Design a protein with these regions (language model features):
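ASCE RecA-like P-loop NTPase motor cores
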Residues: 1-712
Length: 712
């Protein structure tokens, strides 16, 4: 972590030079990106440096940005341990955490008024809280938002969405802003704003008339072009003037604090739509001006949807009121170009810090598994847009479930499984997972520290965002559509073509130095590719980072399975094909704590297992006898194996002359002595003539594992 500390010290010095004397001619404040591999403790070190800086500078004010409110609470708790007082900034609809507040209480006690203000696009505080000190909400004395305004702290912690709104006026300007993890997601609205012909025509003006003509003369859906605007006499300066005119029309207070609900409803009905349209037009004309200034021929943010509608999706950079020295800490940060566009400052990458993983972690990447969302039967519902599970893919889902069961049966301790949210929800509802399995899903991983002590981690699948969505997003960030030459068209079996990602050669790097060839997704356009990587590779790295592989010791080993073909910027110990891993009937047997080796005995002892899967399990067991078992293959005897509870070999013979001696394995959570093993076998297979459980050396036993965990 020495490199990280040096970067932090250098940033502190640079930011002090920026903030020590505030003069108009001073240069823009520094904005630094420090990439720190997940699990290295970047947040902990960053908070320690903040504590030291606050102690050294008694007037220093710091803003700390995290992805959400839950993580904000964790930051405040962590800073308290360092004797630093901090406050979480809470929005109107957030829970009120004040002592004595009802559990269901929100920060705002009149959410209906808040939502009415939003419908009008109004300034919320002036509309429903306090207007010039003369009109106040009748609930102000009990309100969590008003109580929050009285708080004072040198460190405020905010959810990242707050960056895209004006900074709270009651909090002193910050000298430093620390952004811990991603924040660019709030820069682009998920919904498209529609600018309707009827709303444009309702307001007089030459430029509005030009917009009406552009819509009515359009041959169909297409981007708004520079040549079209120039032909209609629209200039950048004229667009800026129109934005100011619309601002005067929009900046009208139509709702006041204390207004009755019926009055507000009438205002929303009569004036809300026109005022909100005016606010949209403020942004629309500002974007037209920026587009003409930029020199692009086609706009990536404004398009003609049809003869009566403009589609508009602006880039919302971080609000100017947050402009100060900024430090970005992120293991999977986007490119500095994207960060600069959103932050409004030139971002420099100052460090990219990686670390060696502990030798007490073994990583296996499993290729060739059918783990894409489509292969697993995960679809988007046409009506709701939500992901749902369909019958197609049932076989693949069953294979994955049985693999998890088999793997969890081999691991002494909790196993974290990370996969798609829809699949996690189905498993939570249907059950069937071993008791030592915990679940998490992609898209909800940043900053989570709940799983740093799991004994196993299984990452299944990968997110792959739709190409059209990523191209549309890239168009917003860059300001111009993706060129046709950057797109890849893939031919279907029926001869038609679909838009997709190119499949290019890639390689998975192993500890031996060998590279295992694989294929990887790639988009030709660098902005689209950067955005895709934030969803695919970055989320996989976040998932793997939950195991905190750098911090493992002899008493806290971990086995990581990555079940997908995507090459990642990590070194894995082994790469194996899906067909060779423990799964099928081994998963069905794992819950009982015993793996049988004989096909007929498997069928008899486990009613759910068919002849095909029983034969497959016997084949797997024959391929992986105890001396070369999956467990020993993962952990060499000279390494962490001495502290892993290995399966015990069991030899048994059923009563009667026609039965031969067979082999089984007692898993770490299964029967561990002759008496319980005999009972297990006789319950399922009938009387036994002979049962013998192998005695393991003390170093391989579960007891040794528990003792080691306490001593290290």
């Amino acid at each position: 972590m020495a490199e990280y500390r040096l970067a932090m010290n250098a940033f502190e010095s640079a930011s002090w030079n920026c903030t020590s004397l505030i003069l108009p001619e001073q240069p823009a404040p520094p904005a630094w990106l420090v990439r720190v591999e997940t699990g290295l403790g970047k947040s902990h070190v960053g908070k320690a440096m903040i504590a030291a800086a606050l102690k050294a500078n008694p007037v220093l004010q710091i803003d700390y940005i995290v992805p959400g409110h839950e993580l904000a609470e964790d930051v405040v708790a962590d800073l308290a341990k360092l004797s630093v007082g901090a406050e979480v900034y809470r929005g109107y609809k957030q829970p009120d955490h004040r002592p004595g507040a009802p559990p269901e209480a929100k920060m705002c006690l009149d959410i209906a008024a808040y939502e009415d203000a939003l419908k009008c696009g109004a300034n919320v505080r002036q509309s429903i809280c306090d207007l010039l000190g003369e009109w106040r909400c009748t609930l102000a004395g009990k309100c969590g938002r008003e109580a929050q305004r009285l708080k004072r702290s040198r460190v405020w912690v905010y959810p990242s969405q707050t960056l895209y709104h004006k900074r709270p006026d009651f909090i002193p300007e910050a000298d430093l802003l620390v952004a811990d993890e991603k924040f660019i997601g709030g820069a682009v609205d998920s919904k498209v704003t529609e600018i309707l012909l009827s709303d444009i025509a309702a307001v007089a003006g030459d430029y509005n008339g030009a917009l009406v003509d552009i819509l009515q003369e359009s041959p169909g859906r297409r981007p708004l072009t520079r040549s079209t605007l120039v032909a209609k006499g629209v200039t950048a300066d004229g667009a800026r003037r129109m934005s100011k005119i619309e601002l005067r029309r929009a900046d009208v207070l139509v709702i006041q604090p204390g207004m009755a609900k019926t009055q507000r409803a009438a205002v929303v009905r009569d004036r809300g739509r026109s005022i909100k349209h005016a606010r949209h037009m403020v942004d629309f004309w500002s974007e037209v001006a920026a587009f003409l200034d930029a020199g692009h021929e086609e706009s990536g943010r404004i398009w003609i949807a049809d003869s009566e509608t403009f589609g508009f999706r602006p880039l919302k950079p971080v609000h100017d009121s947050w402009r100060t020295a900024t430090l970005i800490l992120d293991a999977t940060a986007p490119s500095t170009e994207l960060l600069s566009a959103v932050l409004g400052l030139h971002v420099e990458e100052k460090a990219d810090i990686v670390a060696h993983w502990s030798p007490y972690v073994q990583t296996r990447q499993i290729t060739g598994a059918q783990v894409g969302m489509r292969a697993l039967g995960i679809r988007s519902d046409e009506k709701t847009g939500k992901s749902v599970i369909v019958d197609e893919g049932k076989r693949n889902r069953s294979d994955i479930l049985r693999f998890i069961q088999a793997r969890a049966g081999l691991i002494h301790g909790d196993v974290l499984v990370i996969t798609y949210k829809t699949l996690v929800e189905e498993w939570e509802q249907a059950g069937g997972l071993p008791n030592n399995v915990r679940l998490a899903y992609f898209g909800n991983l940043s900053g989570l520290n709940d799983f740093e002590n799991v004994a196993g981690l299984i990452v299944i699948g990968r997110l792959l965002p739709p190409v059209l969505e990523m191209e549309a997003l890239a168009a917003v960030f860059s300001g111009t559509p993706v060129p046709e030459s950057d797109r890849t068209w893939i031919e279907r079996k029926d001869g038609t073509k679909r838009l997709g990602y190119a499949m290019v050669d890639g390689g998975i790097l192993t500890a031996s130095g060998a590279v295992v060839a694989t294929k990887m997704f790639q988009h030709k356009n660098p902005t689209v590719e950067a955005l895709r990587q934030l969803v695919t590779e970055a989320e996989l790295i976040q998932a793997i980072g939950r195991a905190r592989a750098h911090r493992r010791t002899r008493g806290a080993t971990c086995r990581i399975d990555i079940v997908c073909d995507i090459p990642l910027p990590i070194v894995v110990d082994t790469v194996v094909p899906w067909d060779s891993v423990e799964r099928g009937a081994l998963g069905d047997m794992a819950g009982s704590g015993v793996w049988l080796n004989n096909r007929r005995d498997i069928e008899e002892a486990f009613a759910r297992v068919s002849e095909y899967w029983a034969r497959d399990a016997a084949k797997q067991m024959g391929r992986n006898p105890f001396k070369e078992s999956i467990l020993k293959r993962d952990f060499s005897p000279s390494g962490p194996a001495s502290l892993v509870a290995l399966p015990r070999r069991v030899t048994y013979q059923r009563a009667g002359e026609r039965w031969h001696t067979n082999t089984a394995f007692a898993l770490p959570h299964g029967p561990q002595d002759g008496a319980t093993m005999r009972e297990w076998l006789e319950d399922r297979l009938g009387p036994m003539a002979h049962v013998e459980v192998e005695r393991l050396p003390m170093k391989h036993s579960a007891l040794a594992l528990a003792m080691a965990a306490k001593s290290w």
